[in-house]
UniProtKB/Swiss-Prot annotation:
GO terms for biological process: carbohydrate metabolic process; pentose-phosphate shunt. The lineage of its organism: Bacteria, Bacillati, Cyanobacteriota, Cyanophyceae, Synechococcales. It comes from Prochlorococcus marinus (strain SARG / CCMP1375 / SS120). This is Transaldolase. It is an enzyme of class 2 (transferase). Disulfide bonds: none annotated. The gene is tal.
């Protein structure tokens, strides 16, 4: 019998949601996604300490011997993400998503500048921009930054997407791909309603992605939909046929170990009837987002949590830099 993972791969691009190189080797996905939390976790795996050290050493060389430790760490944040991205691209045939500093989520020009820098770092290690997706938070400022970047041929993955207004604005901006967060939407509704579980197609995250998918396909938008942040296998199965799904290793393993029959739920060639095309000015976007309490709260929470992960990564890099430059060889940890 064919595994669920193989069946899913025949109708959806399967993406690994991890920075763990061994997990990526195991499941052989088409693409891979990273975020600050995943890079932080991977950076603390002893097997990858050499990648961190190389990133810090390259950053020190770039900023100069007289630069402060803070300047080295600031430079190394991007270097580390690109280093992991480069290693991931040695394994997968497709694209890797690398995220812009979440602390820039409300600054359009700073986001553009950071994205250009990341692409330049990839270029220096002979990675084409065609193999990189720049992850940007789906704020108005982030979406406008992505619109500029796309016009320059820099492809963007708009993340932390929870509401329909965000999806509409992303499509209008012509971004390459969006990542609606299925599981985090479910988390909010469970906390809000006190309901412990939702059956498959009634899962609020599944409902949201299905609505967005059908809206995009019915209105002939080129922006792809990549479901993300899953809490259980049922959410994944209910979105079979979505353009892409980015899946954590623990769920990839479950899919690989099951040979149940998979039914396509979404079809880009046969989308279900959807709303007619909507145009959003900035005021409309902000008003729709404000009225969607779930999307507003989860977007804010996501930016805060990713920002905290970046700060923890900074601490880890600072600690490691001091060890390297003092000749020590202690293992990495944020403790």
């Amino acid at each position: 019998m064919t595994s669920l993972l193989d069946q899913l791969s025949s109708m959806t691009v399967v993406v690994a949601d991890t920075g763990d190189l061994e997990a990526i080797r195991t499941f052989k996905p088409q693409d891979a996604t990273t975020n600050p939390s995943l890079i932080l976790a991977a950076a603390q795996i002893p097997a990858y300490q050499n990648l961190i050290d190389k990133s810090l050493q390259a950053s020190r060389q770039r900023v100069g011997s007289f630069a402060s430790a803070k300047e080295v760490v600031d430079e190394a944040l991007d270097e580390v993400c690109v280093t992991f991205g480069k290693e991931i691209l040695k394994i997968i045939p497709g694209r890797v998503s690398t995220e812009v500093d979440a602390r820039l989520s409300f600054n359009t020009q700073a986001t553009i500048n950071k994205a250009r820098k990341i692409i330049d770092l990839y270029k220096k290690v002979d990675i084409s921009k065609e193999r990189v997706l720049i992850k940007v938070a789906s704020t108005w400022e982030g979406i406008k930054a992505a619109e500029v970047l796309e016009s320059e041929g820099i492809h963007c993955n708009l993340t932390l997407l929870f509401g329909f207004s965000q999806a509409v604005a992303c499509a209008e901006a012509g971004v390459t791909l969006i990542s609606p967060f299925v599981g985090r939407i479910l988390d909010w509704y469970k906390a809000e309603t006190g309901k412990d579980s939702y059956a498959g197609e009634e899962d609020p995250g599944v409902v949201s992605v299905t609505k967005i998918f059908n809206y995009y396909k019915s209105n002939n938008y080129k922006t792809e939909v990549m479901g993300a942040s899953f809490r259980n296998i049922d959410e994944i199965l209910e979105l079979a046929g979505c353009d892409l799904l980015t899946i954590a290793p623990k769920f990839l393993e479950q899919l690989e170990n099951s040979d149940s029959k998979l039914t396509r739920k979404l079809d880009s060639l046969k989308p279900l009837p959807s709303e007619t095309k909507i145009h959003l000015e900035e005021y409309d976007f902000r008003n729709m987002l404000k009225l969607d309490r779930m999307a507003t709260e989860k977007l804010e929470e996501g930016i805060i949590n990713f920002s905290k992960a970046i700060e923890q990564l900074e601490q880890l890099l600072s600690k490691r830099l001091s060890y390297i430059e003092s000749g020590s060889n202690a293992e990495l940890s944020i403790a």
